Amino acid sequence: MSATAGTADESGVASAAASADERARAASLARELDEHAYRYYVLDSPTISDAEYDRLMAELAALEERHPDLRTPDSPTQKVAGSYSTLFTPVEHLERMLSLENVFDDDEFHQWAARVARESEVDAWLCELKIDGLAVDLVYEDGYLVRAATRGDGRTGEDITPNIRTLASVPVRLRGPRVPGLLEVRGEVFFPTAKFAELNAGLVAVGGKPFANPRNAAAGSLRQKDPRVTATRPLEMIVHGLGAQRGFEVTSQSAAYARFAELGLPVATHFEVLATVPGVLDYVHRWGDARHDVVHEIDGVVVKVDSFALQRRLGSTSKSPRWAVAYKYPPEEVTTKLRDIRVNVGRTGRVTPFGELEPVLVAGSTVGLATLHNIDEVGRKGVLIGDTVVLRKAGDVIPEIVGPVVDLREGSERAFVMPTRCPECGTELVRPEGEVDIRCPNTVSCPAQLRESIFHFASRGAMDIDGLGYETATALLEAGRVRDIGDIFHLTPESFEGLRGFAQKKIDQILRGVEAARHRPLWRLLVGLSIRHVGPTAARALARELRSLEAIAATSAEDLAAVEGVGPKIAGAVLDWFADERHRDILARIAAGGARLADVGAEEGPRPLDGVTVVITGTLTDWSRDSAKEAVEARGGKVTGSVSRKTTAVVVGADPGASKYDKARSLRIPMLDEAGFAVLLAQGVDAASKLAVPADGPEKAETPVE
């Protein structure tokens, strides 16, 4: 899933204030985009197509362009989409992994290339196929693979080293006599399309659930707890980017690829270095016609400035490099019959219409469902039940219906009528003012909302309860063993008596997961409560600042809104949630079940690093990156992945990242070695500042990030 970033208004011309409708639409778009990003990156279960996601993102970016006051630091247009789960250990990348800006036609590409040319003349563009796979970061030290991680949120991903080691295309040891001391590379893991149907047939034969498409097959195969399962899957990888490095001296992207190949790393065979924009567009269109002639799925072409010096000059925004762009191909389209239109009820009560289709093969997978988003979208597209419809899909789970083929209507088609009552519980549906969505307001007993909320509470992005998935949530609810998320921490072996499909091994797995969840940090509980607008970023900010649910509930709206990363909208939603008596009852049952409602040390008063922002770069001897981050956060501080004027101190270990080191020097931010870091943790900023490392030393070359 990709996102088109908005740009700041630099014209100096005052913008008209946004209307109430525009503000409501922007807020609605932000909520919807955050939800879809969470489903795509964390759950591996998207519910809209890439094209629809891009359309929503473009609409929000356009609103923010017209009214810059709508653009907030936590807007989806300002973030690298993605998150990381806790199924695997979180690890921080040495250099941040950014997402790419998208263009969708020749005119947009010309505009992007013209912006680049205003900075400097470009005499070489590197073009390569955009693989529709899973982004992965590899770290080699002295030639040996020491870590592999998913992209995650761009700063932190999941450690998948044992699984990556099973890929035949990924060398565990680099070749040649001149291996770099440190080399961080980025690439894409993919499932060859020719092997995809074979895998699904095997899964179905043993009663398993088939993957929807090759990208999901790659993600699911790579996220196996048992590397032996990953080893049975024919995964491959292509390396296409450079992160942190020491002893890897090249001056261009193409030279880096040549050096990668010398070291035994898998590189693309179809990239070309071209001198002109017309040459680039010829490459784009040539491969658009031949997109099915390669071993993996592609959804576009990535165009990069080849020169590393010019890449450094162009720099990056908060989410994407200015020196690279993804030219996205239009999604593939087929026609099929729309058999029916039904609705689905989500965890927040949102009622979403979807189409049931005659199964059809498109973009490498067979689909029988397509989202219609909301009742306004059904009307706008003009589709009738029984229509032959145009279906658009670009490697996604649920594609979108573009519209009807009116000429093929026979007269038997009929209009869809949105139900006035919830199909799950019978409650009258409502449409909140300023929203496009219709909702079921019955949060107490609507089976669909209860199922979805339990599934979300237990998901990897929230409380991460191993074994408590959708089917388990459904079984427990239908049998009356739980009422809602408040009963999860009261599950016992007896809760599963008489339920089909729950062997003792499965029950033990779930109960171990519940026990582990009792000790999760506060921010995960906040995410799991399904408070509207509260995602991982806001939850971390609230937990860091206030440290307990009791303190959060007792804080005024004004003070909550003042917390960095929160704001008035989230503050209002939080207090509305706590004001609901049913929610207070749920929290009481969660607490009675032994779960923590506060972070460790919350009752001990001010912490030594309250208000302190730390950046860690390089390798520490006595701390892993995760333990160092936890140590700072436990004392009230915040660890970020990039250096800015808000940074209090930079902790410098062995082999620090060049860009962080140089940025800290240029901003004269105190740099601490490992001894200074220990003092920072024990005694605070004032004591540690006396041990700051002098801001001098040899110049370090900045490495490009992707």
Curated annotation (Swiss-Prot):
Cofactor requirement: Mg(2+); Mn(2+)
Single annotated GO MF: DNA binding
Entry-linked InterPro entries: BRCT_dom (IPR001357), BRCT_dom_sf (IPR036420), DisA/LigA_HHH (IPR041663), DNA_ligase (IPR001679), DNA_ligase_AS (IPR018239), DNA_ligase_CS (IPR033136), DNAligase_adenylation (IPR013839), DNAligase_N (IPR013840)
GO CC annotations on file: cytosol
Sorted UniProt keywords: DNA damage, DNA repair, DNA replication, Ligase, Magnesium, Manganese, Metal-binding, NAD, Zinc
EC number: 6.5.1.2
GO annotation, biological process: DNA repair; DNA replication
Chain residue ranges for the region called Disordered: 1-20
Binding site residues for NAD(+): D50, A51, E52, Y53, D54, S99, L100, E128, R151, E188, K304, K328
Signal peptide coordinates: none
Binding-site positions, Zn(2+): C422, C425, C440, C446
Catalytic activity entry: NAD(+) + (deoxyribonucleotide)n-3'-hydroxyl + 5'-phospho-(deoxyribonucleotide)m = (deoxyribonucleotide)n+m + AMP + beta-nicotinamide D-nucleotide
Annotated catalytic residues: K130
Record-annotated BRCT domain positions: 604-694
Role noted for this protein: DNA ligase that catalyzes the formation of phosphodiester linkages between 5'-phosphoryl and 3'-hydroxyl groups in double-stranded DNA using NAD as a coenzyme and as the energy source for the reaction. It is essential for DNA replication and repair of damaged DNA.
Similarity-based family: Belongs to the NAD-dependent DNA ligase family. LigA subfamily.
HAMAP family registered for this protein in UniProt: DNA_ligase_A
Protein name listed in UniProt: DNA ligase
Source species of the chain: Frankia casuarinae (strain DSM 45818 / CECT 9043 / HFP020203 / CcI3)
Gene (UniProt): ligA
